[in-house]
């Protein structure tokens, strides 16, 4: 789904989401509806469609870490950087008005656990606009990536000043 959605293969993504909606317990009706409007926005780039996708993703993001990550990637691909950072702050830093629910009754999600943050999606083509934003440096510091890079003696990933 993600590869199709973010490489312009919108019809393939629509087929995948429809298949998942009927055959998977992992995708919720909220996710299906959010992806539907988001795929339209990714395809048309029409400001009205983007506004609808932004609203759907903002509504869905606080419901689960998975919906938050998808919202961030979608909004990054749509270059809705401010909204994406609002969701990032809620998911990874537990700050702001869009804090993601992380306890589903099965214990807290690892998505926002400082000991095991899942952040690979920050380094996908869909989130390039987020890495280009000046806030990426402070985010990298706040979630421990900058310290990780420094401690390992490796250069920072894309979007950070080197040295």
Language-model region placement:
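Alpha-helical protein-protein interaction modules
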Residues: 1-163
């Amino acid at each position: 789904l993600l590869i199709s959605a973010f490489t312009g293969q919108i019809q393939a993504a629509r087929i995948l989401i429809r298949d998942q909606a009927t055959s998977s317990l992992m995708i919720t009706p909220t996710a299906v509806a959010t992806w539907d409007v988001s795929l339209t926005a990714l395809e048309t780039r029409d400001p009205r469609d983007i506004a609808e996708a932004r609203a759907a993703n903002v509504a869905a993001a606080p419901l689960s870490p998975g919906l938050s990550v998808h919202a961030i990637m979608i909004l990054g691909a749509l270059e809705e950087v401010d909204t994406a950072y609002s969701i990032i702050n809620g998911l990874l830093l537990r700050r702001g008005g869009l804090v993601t629910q992380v306890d589903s009754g099965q214990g807290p999600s690892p998505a926002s656990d400082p000991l095991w943050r899942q952040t690979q999606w920050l380094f996908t083509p869909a989130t390039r606009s987020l890495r280009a934003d000046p806030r990426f440096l402070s985010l990298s510091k706040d979630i421990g990536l900058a310290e990780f890079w420094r401690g390992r003696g490796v250069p920072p990933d894309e979007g950070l000043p080197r040295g």
